[in-house]
């Protein structure tokens, strides 16, 4: 039986780090579409604020915004250090919208499983990459459950076709929509430090087994405390703090008071492109944030091999071709000195940029 009500759903029910990848495609669809109701569903107040801020900038408002209320415990300050509820707790609140949708666009790998749990089978499902990472996670078999996958560029297309059972017409290269967000949102004149010294941006990943955060955070902080001629933005992925209680580690760097060190464990600036646009040298491990860094403009990168990984022929560490990989403090100090002088990886960054990101007049 034909569905009487037609709607297209854009789901913003993951963390805020997903929103910046989806909000511009969602708004552009809403602007072009006048036949089918466009619905944005937000899973927490931070997501809602990002959507509303971007709506105000673009002037696009012909969509319905559904804001799922937070459970009471999440309205309490510092509830288990959690920033927002898990995705699966949001699904039950929006069943009627899911059942009435013709198509759903999600950034969550597990979303088809949630639909199956509630026996919702009809909508056409789109998955949009929330980043440009190269780890196995981005190519797992759960993606085969989507009807269409919206990807950044050639690298992901080729690897998906090699790894999964997908047809050509299921994969669409759209570029990196977050870059479109950065173009309209970023302030070019923002100043974070009261000096003109080089700014390093340390951005460890949230997955502790792979991240440099626990093993290297004190090393990094002490180095910059002793070297006042450098500035440091110390800003891990927000999930580092979000998962700290669950994973049993402490966040003890919040109270550092040094003129040359900015510690940010979870503000919007961690994710909205502020730091990647202002800093001069990137320090990281396995985060795909480095591709955002290179795509804004090629600059030096330092990667910390905190777990002594044999990375050179490992596709999960493909992005380490962007810069210098260090295993110990001595190598780190050398890499810092070298990075101030010039970007010796400039040419390969430009080549890899073309492999990773499909470009057209409008990427999303």
PLM ranges: what are they?
Residues 168, 288-356:
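Catalytic binding pocket for nucleotide-activated donors in carbohydrate/polymer assembly enzymes
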Residues 21-33, 179-252, 324-326, 357-363:
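Conserved catalytic-core segment of nucleotide-activated headgroup transferases in glycan assembly
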Residues 7, 102-103, 124, 148, ...:
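Structural motif
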Residues 94-97, 118, 142, 193, ...:
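Structural alpha-helical scaffold elements that stabilize or flank donor/cofactor-binding regions
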Residues 10-32, 39-183:
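Active-site and donor-binding regions of nucleotide-sugar-utilizing enzymes
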Residues 116-133, 220-223, 297-309:
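A short, gly/pro- and small-residue-rich
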């Amino acid at each position: 039986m034909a569905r009487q009500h037609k709607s297209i759903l854009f789901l913003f029910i993951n963390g805020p780090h997903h929103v910046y990848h989806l909000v511009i495609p969602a708004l552009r669809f809403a602007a072009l579409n006048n036949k089918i109701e466009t619905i944005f569903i937000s899973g927490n107040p931070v997501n809602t604020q990002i959507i509303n801020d971007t709506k105000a900038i673009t002037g696009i408002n012909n969509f319905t915004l559904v804001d799922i209320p937070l459970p009471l415990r999440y309205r309490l300050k510092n509830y288990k250090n959690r920033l927002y509820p898990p995705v699966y707790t949001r699904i039950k609140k929006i069943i009627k919208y899911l059942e009435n949708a013709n198509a759903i666009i999600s950034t969550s790998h597990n979303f088809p499983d949630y639909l199956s749990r509630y026996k919702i089978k009809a909508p056409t499902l789109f998955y949009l990459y929330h980043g440009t990472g190269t780890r196995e996670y981005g190519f797992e078999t759960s993606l085969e459950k989507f009807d269409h996958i919206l990807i950044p560029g050639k690298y992901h297309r080729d690897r998906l076709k090699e790894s999964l059972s997908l047809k050509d017409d299921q994969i669409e290269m759209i570029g990196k929509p977050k870059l479109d967000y950065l173009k309209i949102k970023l302030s070019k004149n923002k100043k974070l430090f009261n000096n003109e010294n080089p700014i390093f941006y340390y951005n460890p990943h949230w997955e502790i087994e792979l991240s440099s955060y626990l093993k290297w955070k004190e090393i990094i902080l002490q180095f910059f405390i002793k070297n006042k001629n450098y500035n440091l933005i110390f800003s891990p992925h927000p999930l580092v703090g979000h998962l700290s209680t669950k994973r049993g580690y402490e966040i003890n760097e919040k109270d550092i008071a040094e003129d040359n060190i900015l510690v940010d464990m979870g503000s919007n600036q961690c994710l909205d492109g502020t730091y990647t646009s202002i800093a001069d040298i990137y320090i990281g491990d396995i985060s795909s944030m480095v591709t955002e860094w290179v795509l804004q403009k090629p600059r030096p990168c330092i990667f910390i091999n905190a777990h002594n990984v044999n990375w050179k022929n490992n596709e999960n560490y493909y992005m380490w071709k962007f810069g210098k990989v260090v295993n110990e403090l001595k190598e780190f100090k050398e890499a810092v000195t070298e990075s101030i002088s010039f970007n010796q990886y400039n040419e390969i960054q430009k080549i890899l940029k073309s492999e990773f990101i499909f470009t057209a007049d409008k990427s999303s």
